[in-house]
Amino acid sequence: MKVLLIGDYSNLHACLAAELRRRGIDVTLVSDGGAYMNTDHDIYLSRTPGIQGAFHYLRDVYELSNSLTGYDVVQLVNPGFAHLRPEKLKFFLDRFRKRNGGLFLTLAGDDYYFVKACNDGVFKFSEYKIGDRLTELGKTEEFTGWLRDDVRKYTEYLYGILDGAMSALPEYDIAARPVLGDKLKYCGIPIDLEQLKYAEFDNSDERVNLFLGMKEEYSLRKGTGILQKILQELVDEMPDRCRLIKVSNISIQEYYDKMRAAHIVTPAAPARTTARS
C-alpha cells in the first residue's frame, strides 16, 4: 500500500508516517517540517514571504500535484493543507483526488466546522468564546476568517467528498461528527515512542525539574504564558526544591533532549478536554 500524507501539525503526521513504515507501508510525507521544529518529511514544501515567494510556492504545489500520483491513500492534515486561498485549495484537491485513490482528512487544527462549533456554543468554553463572551482570539480576523463564505463552501465541498477522516482531539471529533458521521474515527494524537526512550535521571541535585515547552506564537491560544507565570512563582517561592526549564521555538530533537531532564512536563494549559492538558 502507498500512502501520501500532505502537511503536518506539530509532528502528528511524521509520527503517523513512522509507525506506518514500521508496518511495511510505503509512505511519502510532504510538509514544511513545522518550520523551526524541523520535523521529519520526505518532500519539503514551504512558502516564503512576498509575491515571488507566492509564485514559487504555487509552482511547487502544481508540480507536486503532477508528480505525486498512484497512491492508494491521500491524507490531508487539515482542509488548509497548503498555504493557499480556498479556490486554489479546491483546484489542487481535485487534482490529487483524480490522480490517486481514497481521500482522507486528519482533523488537526482549526477549520470551518470547528470554529463554527465554538461560535455556536457547542462548547461551554473555547479559545474563541467563554459562554457568550468573545475572548481576545475571538475578536481577531483569524476567528472571523474561518467563518467566511468562501471558506465555508470549500470546507463543505471537501467534507462531502471524503472517504474517511480521523480526529486528533475529542473537540475536533465533536465538531465534525454531525457532518461526517460514521466516516469519522477518533484516533487521538500519534506519538512515536521510539523517540521517547526511557532515560535514568541524575538526581544528585534533588531539585524537581519543571519543564515548559512553548510556541511563542501560540502562547495566548495554549495558555503557556499563564503557565510560565505560575511555574516561575513556584520556583521563586522554593528555589531550593525546584527549577524551571523553559524552551520555545526550537527543533523537535532539541525539544526531546531538553525534556529528558524533566520530572514534570507542562506543555499547555487545560482546554476543553484532557487531550490538551
PLM regions: where:
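N-terminal subdomain of nucleotide-sugar transferases
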Residues: 1-43, 98-101
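Short N-terminal targeting/anchoring amphipathic segment
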Residues: 2-6, 65-88, 102-106, 266-267
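A conserved mid-protein helix/loop that constitutes part of the nucleotide-sugar donor-binding site
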Residues: 11-15, 218-233
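Acceptor-binding helix/loop patch of EC 2.4 sugar-transfer enzymes
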Residues: 39-42, 105-149
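Membrane-proximal helix-turn-helix segments that form the acceptor-binding/catalytic region
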Residues: 62, 68, 91-98, 128-164
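A short, active-site helix/loop in glycosyltransferases that binds the activated sugar's phosphate group
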Residues: 114-115, 142-184, 229, 233
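Conserved donor-binding/catalytic core segment of Leloir-type glycosyltransferases
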Residues: 185-222, 228
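Acidic donor-binding loop of glycosyltransferase active sites
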Residues: 260-273
